[in-house]
């Protein structure tokens, strides 16, 4: 075929050009091209042979390795996808004592009791949370922060008992370790006990790390549990100063702890006298018609104002709603252990004298 293209046409005579035999020259060119073509084919074949041989070596082992790595990756990463799995389930414990039978026929009392499923950390109080509008007109929830505290908390308990009514007490963990007997009185009277951090730190303070914020929450839970003799508090929490850092709201949601804001802030910590507490609460309540009221059993003026405030609530046709958690919140063992480093042993004995000193002879 090459010869037919590069040689003489069929029947053509050889010609000479300037003494050169064109037939001979044509033959030499043709032979050279044939040899060049043969070498090219040989080299190309060798190259294809090397390429074909290299492909199985490079590609075949790589595919199983990649597949194995891909298959192993989800198994390693799976536990991190469910952070709440690290938290213990709610503890099983004896039911809380019921409120004492009411002997006051004119008492404010408790109109209804609601049980809260705290799964996912629902929020209550329209100052921050608008989703769960469960209170009916003229319904009120009484809440008290910062206790327990000598004199003031017992005075609040007496005012509530006199009116056969109840509230939620958000206890500071450190205060609970100072006054465990008072907190036990709160529980024994049938009131709901939530938590309010370990030391009342503002969790929006940028100087606090995330670990420190979590410690404030968790050590507060551990402290209240310790003060109650191993009884876990309700899965209810209120942020100090109503400062809600978003990452801690998420954390409490994973912890299945409900968050409480308020509808009516009494600003009792600013009040110069008991009457001011009553005036502030009733003015806001008459405007809104219902709501969660924020007060402090830590404050002297609140304890003094509460008997008259409860009278005003009854006279105004308001009704008290009791809130309780469907389940308590479990403390975390690492914070239970950490708490033991900070608990201050009581310096005053709570035992009766005759249990300590016994006359054996006279």
Where on the chain are the PLM-derived regions?
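N-terminal pre-catalytic segment of deacetylase/amide-hydrolase enzymes
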Residues: 23, 28-33, 39, 43-143, ...
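Active-site beta->alpha N-cap acidic-glycine motif
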Residues: 101-210, 216-225, 229-234, 289
């Amino acid at each position: 075929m090459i010869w037919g293209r590069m040689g003489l046409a069929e029947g053509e005579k050889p010609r000479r050009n300037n003494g050169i035999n064109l037939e001979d020259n044509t033959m030499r060119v043709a032979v050279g091209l044939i040899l060049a073509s043969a070498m090219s084919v040989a080299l190309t074949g060798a190259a294809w042979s090397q390429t074909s041989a290299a492909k199985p070596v490079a590609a075949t082992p790589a595919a199983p390795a990649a597949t194995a790595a891909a298959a192993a990756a989800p198994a390693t990463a799976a536990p991190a996808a469910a952070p709440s799995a690290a938290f213990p389930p709610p503890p099983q414990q004896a039911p809380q004592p019921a409120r004492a039978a009411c002997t006051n026929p004119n008492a404010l009392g408790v109109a209804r009791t609601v049980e809260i499923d705290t799964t996912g950390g629902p929020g209550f109080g329209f100052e921050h949370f608008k989703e769960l509008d469960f209170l009916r007109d003229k319904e009120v929830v009484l809440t008290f922060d910062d206790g327990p505290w000598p004199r003031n908390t017992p005075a609040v308990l007496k005012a509530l008992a006199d009116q056969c009514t109840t509230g939620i007490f958000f206890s500071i963990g450190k205060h609970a370790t100072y006054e465990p007997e008072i907190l036990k009185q709160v529980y024994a009277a049938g009131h709901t006990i939530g938590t309010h951090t370990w030391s009342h730190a503002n969790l929006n303070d940028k100087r606090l790390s995330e670990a420190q914020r979590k410690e404030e929450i968790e050590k507060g839970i551990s402290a209240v549990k310790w003060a109650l003799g191993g009884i876990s508090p309700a899965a209810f929490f209120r942020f100090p100063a109503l400062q809600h850092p978003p990452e801690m709201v998420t954390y409490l949601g994973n912890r299945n702890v409900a968050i409480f804001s308020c509808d009516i802030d009494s600003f009792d910590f600013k009040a110069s006298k008991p009457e001011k507490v009553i005036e502030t609460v009733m003015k806001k309540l008459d405007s809104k018609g219902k709501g969660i009221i924020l007060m402090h059993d830590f404050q002297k003026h609140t304890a003094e104002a509460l008997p008259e405030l409860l009278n005003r609530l009854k006279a105004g046709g308001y009704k008290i709603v009791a809130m309780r958690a469907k389940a308590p919140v479990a403390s975390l063992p690492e914070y239970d252990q950490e708490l033991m480093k900070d608990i201050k042993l009581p310096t005053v004995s709570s035992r009766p004298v005759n249990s300590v000193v016994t006359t054996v002879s006279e």
